[in-house]
A protein has these predicted regions:
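Non-catalytic membrane-proximal stalk/linker segments that position and tether the catalytic domains
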Residues: 1-7, 243-482, 568
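Short, acidic, metal-binding catalytic loop of nucleotide-sugar glycosyltransferases
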Residues: 28-38
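Nucleotide-activated donor-binding/catalytic signature segment of Leloir-type glycosyltransferases, i.e.
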Residues: 64, 536-537, 729-750
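Conserved donor NDP-sugar-binding/catalytic core segment of glycosyltransferases
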Residues: 113-141
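Acidic donor-binding loop at a coil-to-helix junction in glycosyltransferase catalytic cores
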Residues: 182-189
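Aromatic "clamp/platform" in nucleotide-sugar-dependent glycosyltransferases that forms part
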Residues: 767
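Short hydrophobic beta-strand element within catalytic cores of glycosyltransferases
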Residues: 784-787, 797
């Protein structure tokens, strides 16, 4: 029972327009309420042109003086009428604690408001109480039961306007939108209340009777639904963004149930890096079967994962956990069940992913440490009572699908000892079959209908709202801005090293950084990637990277994927980012427009214009020009490239100059120490190093010719050739003839520092370049650079002052010029030492923090805006 107060505790607002006859039923049902508190009724005539409406209102005022109040206003629409009533109630009765909205063609049962008011008083944390919908006329009984879900409310209007709303909701500023003339203004009102921090509560047997006709205002609203929902989503934009949707999913209907065999508990979460609710097995079984019996009312995870804490920790260590869950989710939706096996045989500093789709090839050298099962398949297995194992049901899937993912980690890393996940899954299934909860799994006592999405699939709302495939379970941590770097492959080239270093600097500035590898399913060097990024992700789309000979822009080919790829799937992987940097990933151009529509800041990082076999300019600079409209910024690695982009049509305000820096930072004092050590070395053979890929671009033929000339001249030179061989893995025959040992690419900072500490000269004879990072990091420690004048090399090297530039020419001419220069340096170490010291001095403050600082400040401002 409620305490007696002086004055009405509850107000009923009845807006009316052209329902002069039905109005009588509505007001009578409000007057007949059986309550232990006082009720006042406010009729708002919204400028109805029918005289009968006005007379009916007057009749009720005279028939129930003090209880029925009448306001007549100019026509403004349903929202305006309700707001007029709200203002009148708030200004007239301080005693009113709640307001109920009753449409003039509906009615309520005698005990409705007593029950609703008591529910409101029992739950001080809620803002309103809402009913089921029981229709008459066209009969239908709608089930809106279960715990209130904001996530579901974003997809469907689950709260009828005929709800009881606490006064404080209006005091906080919630009102009906008077510009909404097409309907669903109540949906908009509830979302406003949600934004103000209020939540609803469903009340069974509320007592609302809703009149339904074949044609009505509600029917018109359904026809205009797309226009209305678009307006609502724009107005309440923060609610419909990824961060909000994902956080709501995690709280209300987490998609993953992770059973860790070492703890015996199930964690319910939508992000493997975020702790969710923890349940013991019996409690989990109860919730599982309860949701199986009443899927509209209760939630259960859509995917059950069996693993151990040690494996999840291992995945987090390599920044792979969120991506692995996303990738397994994309596979298990087709397969029903997928295994993950982890090995440590990828080679040094390397990670590699292999997906096995052949049902006959589902065995791994390592037992699976994780199994993910779709709940739908679990149900089929539990209902069948099959003794053949869950894989026998998965084999019935009609499409050829993946069964096993193998993750190979660096071979110098220890793996945790893991129990086979298959055995744990079998135990879990046996326990579920034996569980007493199964006694009520098939029984549903609900006679009402529900056309909404079942609660266990609310996680799909995020996909639909964002128009993507499965979304990566990546939560925003501590409010950090999130940026993704998109690469075709993640190796140790200049494009990749630029991305790694920009990410490192942004991470130090408080960003959360993420690496996305589109074309390759491997990456290196692991340590640098782990240091620079908070997550590592592979698109794993076999159609990426296939070039279309018929699709060109200014002579450069585009990949097939830009016009026919699985863009929604990729956008799901990228969901939740504030900014993306496309680092020469041609396929990713297709994603920039939809990302910008989601207010993601888009940046293209350009490094170099390639040359074709016929020395025709082509490549990423031209491809990016074709998509220039979709980018907010285009970052150029040199002034030369900046000027070219501007000259070819890109507005100067969109361009940013980000000069390349060294590929890795050095501890304070290290560069100076290396320079001192080199100067103090005893005279000996000139130490000349070639560091980079052994291919046409890097001038392999020029290098070979130079070595041959220096050997013929018997110059005192010690050579080191360091880099990857050609694609097929064989040693170039020219170098074989010279008997030059090729050292593998140096992937760690210590290895690179040793190389630079050893060398006097680094020789770079490229056919084309941007601004090579090797030049900057060599000069930083006093290594004298001898390089061809291509690209923007001259922006870092001043000829005869901080290095030496060789004019671009044919192979023979360049080799001859390089050999003459090396002979000069062999003979005059004073020149070598002078240039060495000048180079080190010139690079003293040339760091990524300084070269990228202005651009990153602009990027941060753009993201804030």
């Amino acid at each position: 029972m409620t305490d007696r107060i002086s004055g009405p505790a509850l107000a009923v607002i009845v807006p009316v327009y052209k329902h002069s006859v039905l109005l009588g039923e509505a007001i009578t049902s409000a007057l007949n309420q059986e309550t232990d508190f006082e009720i006042c009724i406010v009729i708002v005539n919204d400028g109805c042109p029918l005289p009968e409406t006005h007379q009916t209102c007057l009749d009720f005022v005279s028939g129930a003086p003090g209880r029925v109040h009448y306001i007549r206003r100019q026509n403004g629409g349903l929202s305006a009428a309700r707001n007029t009533g709200v203002e009148h109630v708030l200004n007239t009765w301080e005693t009113v604690r709640a307001i109920y909205f009753l449409d003039a063609d509906n009615r309520i049962l005698p005990g409705a408001l007593q029950r609703a008011y008591e529910a409101l008083e029992e739950s001080p944390e809620i803002g309103w109480v809402y009913p089921n919908i029981d229709m008459f006329g066209q009969e239908w009984n709608g089930d809106f039961s279960g715990e209130y879900s904001v996530l579901r409310h974003l997809e469907e209007n689950i709260c009828e306007a005929g709800s009881l709303v606490r006064r404080v909701v209006f005091a906080a500023g919630a009102r009906f939108d008077e510009s909404m003339k097409l309907g669903f203004e109540d949906w908009d009102f509830w979302l406003t209340a949600v934004e103000l921090g209020f939540r609803g509560r469903h009340l069974d047997n509320f007592g609302l009777r809703y009149r339904k006709r074949p044609e009505s205002m509600v029917r018109d609203s359904d026809r205009d639904r797309l226009e209305i929902t678009s307006y609502i989503q724009r107005k309440h934009k923060p609610l419909f963004e990824f961060d909000s949707l994902h956080a709501l999913e995690h709280r209300e209907a987490p998609r993953y149930g992770i059973f860790k065999s070492n703890t015996g508990c199930v964690g319910l979460t939508s992000d493997p890096n975020v702790e969710g609710r923890r349940l013991g097995l019996e409690d989990f079984f109860d919730e599982y079967y309860r949701a199986k019996s009443a899927p509209m009312r209760y939630s259960r995870p859509a995917f059950v994962i069996v693993t151990q804490t040690a494996l999840l920790d291992c995945l987090r260590q390599f920044r792979l956990s969120q991506w692995i869950f996303w990738y397994l989710e994309t596979l298990v939706e087709l397969s029903g069940v997928v295994h993950l096996a982890v090995r440590n045989d990828a080679g040094p500093h390397r990670i590699e992913v292999k997906t096995i789709c052949d049902p006959a090839d589902t065995t791994s050298r390592e037992p699976a440490g994780l199994v993910i099962v779709k709940t739908e398949l679990l149900d089929r297995y539990l209902d069948s009572g099959s003794a053949n194992g869950i894989m026998s049901l998965a084999a019935d899937m009609t499409r050829p699908t993946a069964r096993l993912v193998e993750l190979a980690l660096p071979d110098d890393r220890d793996l945790p000892s893991l129990a086979p996940a298959d055995a744990t899954l079998h135990m879990l299934l046996q326990r579920m079959q034996d569980c007493r909860s199964r006694l009520y799994q098939g029984t549903s006592w609900n006679w009402r209908e529900n056309s909404f999405r079942i609660k266990g699939e609310l996680f799909k709302i995020t996909r639909d709202m964002l128009n993507t495939g499965p979304v990566c379970p990546r939560s925003r941590q501590n409010g950090k801005r999130q940026i993704g770097f998109l690469l075709p492959l993640a190796d140790f080239g200049g494009v990749e090293k630029t991305a790694y270093n920009l990410a490192r600097v942004l991470k130090a500035r408080g960003w959360s950084t993420h690496l996305f590898v589109f074309s390759s399913q491997s990456c290196r060097p692991v340590d640098q990637i782990v240091d620079a990024f908070d997550s590592l992700n592979f698109l794993c789309d076999p159609e990426v990277g296939k070039w279309d000979p018929n699709q060109r822009f200014m002579g450069s080919h585009y990949p097939n994927w830009v016009s026919s790829g699985q863009h929604q799937r990729a956008l799901g992987l990228l969901a939740g980012l504030d900014a993306v940097v496309n680092c020469h990933c041609a396929d990713a151009h297709a994603l920039m427009a939809p990302l910008r529509r989601r207010d993601v800041t888009t940046v293209a990082s350009l490094q170099v214009t390639d040359l074709s076999a016929l020395d025709r300019p082509s490549g990423q600079t031209y491809l990016t020009l074709g998509y220039e409209y979709t980018y907010d910024h285009i970052a150029c690695c040199s002034q030369q490239l900046f000027d070219w982009c501007h000259a070819i049509g890109i507005p100067e305000g969109k361009l940013a100059l980000v000069l390349n820096g060294p590929s890795y930072p050095l501890p304070a004092g290290t560069a100076e120490a290396i320079v001192r050590t080199r100067l103090a070395r005893r005279p000996g053979p000139l130490r000349v190093m070639s560091l980079g890929r052994l291919d046409r671009q890097k001038g392999l033929d020029r290098l070979v010719a130079t070595i041959m000339l220096t050997r013929r001249a018997a110059l005192p030179i010690d050579w080191r050739v360091i880099g990857d061989t050609v694609i097929d893995g064989t040693v170039p025959p020219e170098l074989e003839q010279l008997r030059v040992e090729i050292e593998p690419a140096k992937l760690t900072q210590d290895e690179l520092t040793e190389c630079y500490g050893w060398a006097d000269v680094v020789l770079i004879l490229s056919r084309w370049e941007g601004l090579p990072l090797t030049i900057v990091e060599a000069m930083r420690v006093g290594v004298v650079v001898c390089a061809t004048t291509v690209g923007a090399v001259a922006e870092a090297v001043s000829h005869e002052e901080t290095g030496f530039l060789l004019p671009s020419a044919g192979t023979a001419a360049i080799a001859a010029a390089a050999a003459r220069l090396l002979q000069r340096l062999c003979q005059d170490r004073r020149v070598l030492n002078r240039v060495s010291l000048a180079a080190a001095h010139a690079m003293k403050d040339w760091t990524w923090e300084t070269t990228a600082g202005d651009f990153l400040a602009r990027l941060e401002q753009l993201v804030r805006e």
